[in-house]
Amino acid sequence: MFDGRSDIYDSTSFAAELDDLYSCRSTGRENGRRSRVSTRGVHRDRCGSAAKRRSTKRRCELVARERDRYSLYLDYMASHPSDEISAVRELVVPLIKTTSITLPFDLNQTVADNCLSLSGMGYYLGIGGCCPTCTVSGEPRLHRADRAALILAYVQQLNNIYEYRGFLASVLAAAAQGDQAGVAASEGVQAERLLENVLAQPELFFAYHVLRDGGIQNVRVLFYRDLSVSGYMMYAVFPTKSVHLHYRLIDRLLAACPGYKIIAHVWQTAFVLVVRRDEGQQTDMDIPTVSAGDIYCKMCDLSFDGELLLEYKKLYAVFDDFLPPV
């Protein structure tokens, strides 16, 4: 506006400076208005801001530092599985206490210390001793149930026929329903033949014995012909609306029935375990046989409860339409 060498007023330079000043103000006002308009109701992406970049870089540095801190320990554990298992066992509180499952569920999919809980609230596996049900109920009182004890109970059932009346009453109810399809015989003959076929698969009796020994006294068992393999399969129907199988009970069930699949399922409102032969597995053939005729004679001398037989007839009517899982 003024020349440095003199105080002579230069109108041309003054007009140019005014134009520059006005253009700067207009540009600033436009940018401010544009920034205000662009932020009305619209989320501004600030991922490219310097502060965001610094925060992301800082976070990555912290993660890398933590990874480097434990990398030697984790690499050592990965190369020494036995030490890794020992470290996991020393954990007081498990990392995961429950895992949701869907039905049908094969019990062979469980791992060590997995309990099974079924109820209207859901189906899940729990870590033994840490699952909510185990925390409340505690450890079950299980008697000896190794292979020798199961075989002894199977052989001596003739002398303890009243104790296993729930198992034998199902045979009478199934014979009354006409289980022996295509066989024209009296109800007594059908019952004896069905009993012989069921006793030819000792694992079915073993599963029933283990469940009763595990505290499930009122479990009901149903016998149906297995069309996929020769023989019969058994449905163990639970009387309650919720079921909890302790991991020790599951281990005993699986150990008692080699060559069989045990699958948890639900039908209408009843939870059931389906015990059936596995086509690709061999069963134990070194089990003494028992006389079905002698046991049936004892059954004829025993007066079965009419309510128990009626309950079985109703259960057979309910499960006639049930399709067992493969």
Swiss-Prot record:
Domain of life (superkingdom): Viruses
Quaternary structure note: Forms a heterohexameric complex with NEC2. Interacts with capsid vertex specific component 2/CVC2; this interaction directs the capsid to the host inner nuclear membrane to initiate budding.
Protein role: Plays an essential role in virion nuclear egress, the first step of virion release from infected cell. Within the host nucleus, NEC1 interacts with the newly formed capsid through the vertexes and directs it to the inner nuclear membrane by associating with NEC2. Induces the budding of the capsid at the inner nuclear membrane as well as its envelopment into the perinuclear space.
Keywords attached to this entry: Host membrane, Host nucleus, Membrane, Metal-binding, Phosphoprotein, Zinc, Zinc-finger
InterPro entries associated with the record: Herpes_UL31
Single biological process term from Gene Ontology: viral budding from nuclear membrane
Protein name: Nuclear egress protein 1
PTM characteristics: Phosphorylated at serine residues in the N-terminus. This phosphorylation regulates the localization within the inner nuclear membrane.
CCCH-type zinc-finger residues: 115-244
Location in the cell: Host nucleus inner membrane
Protein family (similarity comment): Belongs to the herpesviridae NEC1 protein family.
Gene Ontology cellular component terms for the protein in this record: host cell nuclear inner membrane; membrane
GO molecular function ontology, one term from the record: zinc ion binding
Disulfide bridge map: none
